[in-house]
């Protein structure tokens, strides 16, 4: 009897089947390509355990419902599918790797193409799994060096035009903000978008907080995505007896702040120490941020900063000094000497 072969590449859940990552393909006629018509979530683990997975999946279901995408699957079933993908891929992960899930729900074929192309009409549920280190290892220095907050000319799309609480792939305004920051002369810059009234909203995939007089302030949530990590900051702050206030914040409030930080799933929270190159507060990582990141690390049983730094030690790319954690700008190519 021939023993079953072990997977040699990561496995993806694709519409009820487990397929090799290289074989998970969408049709060129899918609405995802036509309109960015996708509800999605991205998660991470700590010590191999998924963090707030149910909350992410509940938001995924809500986003799909708002978009009229018929995702006919319970949160419990989605959890099972996610855990199956992780179990399939764990043998290919290093012992210190964390699992970063990427869960996409596309509408499927546009009605124009239904019954005209020989493929299922959709919707499509795709669950991919890759090492967290890909996302954070080249930006680990931000935990100690801090972020330079930059407000681009691109504005946040207000809730009166597009519901921001729906997490979807149609994020061209994020892309335009990052394109602008790719020409920023400073380093470690992350974009912070303002709304049409000039109030602070969110980063391109992150929420934002400032600290003043030992109180945490964050933009009121009408015009932003209410992040899972944002909610967890509220939980930690309550346990630490730190007041959190949601209110309209202006760029002036950021310049006058004692500390600032971003929250997002892969990084948890990252300090911001400059605003357009000028120091925020003392211009270094502050005590309230330090309390929060230490508490977060204790709760999940992982030293978040040390883990990122350990990943950085294995990187072949070096520091991501560009404008976003996703290295939007291409690194400069070194000219080779001619003989």
State what each model feature region is.
Residues 1-88, 111-339:
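Helix-start/capping segments and mature chain N-termini
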Residues 53-54, 91-98:
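Short, flexible active-site-proximal loops enriched in glycine and acidic residues
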Residues 98-105:
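ATP-grasp fold ATP-binding core
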